[in-house]
Design a protein with these regions (language model features):
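Short beta-strand and strand-turn-strand segments in soluble, beta-rich domains
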Residues: 35-51, 184-194
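Contiguous beta-strand segments within globular domains
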Residues: 2-16, 155-165
């Protein structure tokens, strides 16, 4: 990629199936660069294409990226996940999947007097291990990218100091200095109040701020990270998405953290293990509660000391993604029997044989997708719903996208069902949160999409998770 204010040397390679020449049937009349997105980049020709007696030639140009160059990004945007639709940033591209890339090379021929133009986006070439040479369209990105590890989370009410780490990346080919600071809610302070960075070309650095919330209540707060360099402010970062064979594109995120003050109690001495499945950010969310789980490897499942953990969480669809999990199911059940807590997040049908007592999803897996539905608490005084936080129907308010999937259809009498919810026209679903005492420990199955709610800082999801991992305390 390139950044505003930089130069790029572009080689345009032109070839044809036959020779061209002045006055011949096939003539190459000109080669040039253009900006399909409507920008104007100053271009200097360094080496002209040959128009005589050949069927292949190169033209070389220097393209200067203006300071106000349009960044390569989607022409549509959505300010937050609460908004159900996208807004059009640039109506010129409304009938296209993406806005055009910023620079293209063109050649014009005449064949028997008929003009023919051919063009291609300008591409950069690099090598990837295992793939080899890969060509990607040239893109324009900001000089500095500002990123946060997460964009939403909780701050337990009563917290006096809370860390927030900001990563600043220099995407230019020159060393840059930058000053980083946070825009905080009124009355909040941080230390340091700013951070000075010396960034190498392509380099990145972290700054961790100790944030001191004042008057923290059960509401949303917004914190923005800003990096200043060369008299300009930068307050967003981007991810490059795509893979070999699919043109990459660039998705931007504002460097904004949405913090939610939450009344939550979490035992301070919990030790938690996590078995990652197909991928989620639950371990990071647990960190916001002061719990820093250990990611368990296949070797840990086979021979590790599981008894050191107060609770072990099984990630979403882990029984499908981790063969070692099913192979060592008895070790996990032994861990529960000896006093541990095993929390199984939503799975597919294959996990049923790994439970201590019979349970199943049934022939048709039940999902509950209307997050506006009401969740009924069936056993409000059950310890799992009272310790250390009292869970009520209000903890299921404000959920995003869905309540959950893979609700159980059948379960043994050893299990207790704690909640009920259903979509309109659907039979009541009580298989979303069930648990059983097994030996000295507790086995829990939860199909509620906690992993999705934790990402969005939904207070009730954190409070419920705190109760689940505390079940053995």
């Amino acid at each position: 990629w390139v950044t505003p204010g930089s130069d790029a040397e572009v080689r345009v390679h032109v070839t044809a199936a036959q020779d061209w020449s002045n006055g011949g049937t096939l003539q190459l009349t000109r080669v040039w660069l253009a900006n399909p997105n409507g920008d104007h980049w100053p271009v200097t020709q360094l080496d002209a294409a040959s128009t005589q007696g050949t069927n292949a030639t190169d033209a070389v140009f220097r393209a200067s990226v203006p300071d106000d160059a349009t960044l390569t990004r989607p022409y549509f945007t959505r300010p937050n996940t609460e908004q159900a639709h996208y807004e059009i940033r640039d109506a010129r591209w409304a009938e296209r999947p993406f806005a055009p890339y910023p620079l293209a090379g063109w050649a014009e021929f005449t064949y028997d007097g008929v003009p023919v133009r051919v063009g291609q986006v300008v591409q950069t070439v690099h090598r990837e291990h295992g793939t080899g040479q890969v060509a990607w369209p040239l893109a324009v990105v900001p000089r500095l990218s500002v990123n946060l590890a997460a964009h939403a989370g909780i701050i337990p009410i009563g917290t006096e100091t809370w860390p927030l780490t900001v990563t600043v990346r220099n995407d230019t080919q020159k060393a840059r200095t930058a000053e980083v600071h946070l825009k905080l809610p009124q009355g909040w302070t941080d230390s340091p109040d700013s951070g000075s960075l010396q960034l190498a070309p392509g380099g990145a650095q972290d700054v961790t701020f100790a944030v001191h919330p004042k008057g923290l209540a059960g509401q949303n707060y917004e914190i923005e990270a800003v990096a200043t360099s060369g008299g300009k402010d930068f307050a967003e970062g981007f991810d490059q998405v795509g893979y070999a064979g699919l043109r990459p594109y660039y998705l931007y995120q504002p460097a904004t953290y949405r913090a939610r003050g939450v009344a939550i109690q979490v035992p301070s001495d919990l030790k938690v293990g996590y078995i990652m499945g197909t991928g989620d950010d639950v371990p990071q969310a647990l960190g916001e509660m002061g719990i820093h789980p250990t990611l368990l490897t296949d070797a840990d499942l086979a021979t590790g000391n599981l008894d050191q953990y107060n609770a072990i969480l099984v990630g979403i669809r882990a029984y499908s993604a981790r063969p070692a999990l099913m192979a060592n199911k008895q070790r996990l059940l032994n861990y529960v029997h000896q006093g541990g807590t095993l929390i199984v997040q939503y799975q597919r049908t294959e996990f049923g044989s790994a439970a201590p007592y019979p349970l199943s999803l049934g022939n048709e897996v039940e999902n509950v997708v209307e997050e506006s539905d009401t969740v009924h608490i069936l056993q409000p005084n059950d310890p799992l719903l009272t310790t250390p936080n009292r869970i009520t129907a209000a903890d299921f308010d404000g959920w995003f996208e869905e309540f959950g999937h893979s609700f159980l259809s059948n379960w043994d009498a050893h299990y207790s069902a704690l909640t009920e919810v259903h979509d309109p026209g659907q039979a009541p679903q009580r298989g979303g949160l069930v648990y059983a005492r097994y030996g000295k420990g507790t086995y829990i199955y939860v199909s509620y999409a906690l992993y999705r709610q934790l990402d969005e800082a939904v207070p009730g999801a954190f409070r419920l998770m705190a109760n689940l991992i505390s079940a053995g305390k």
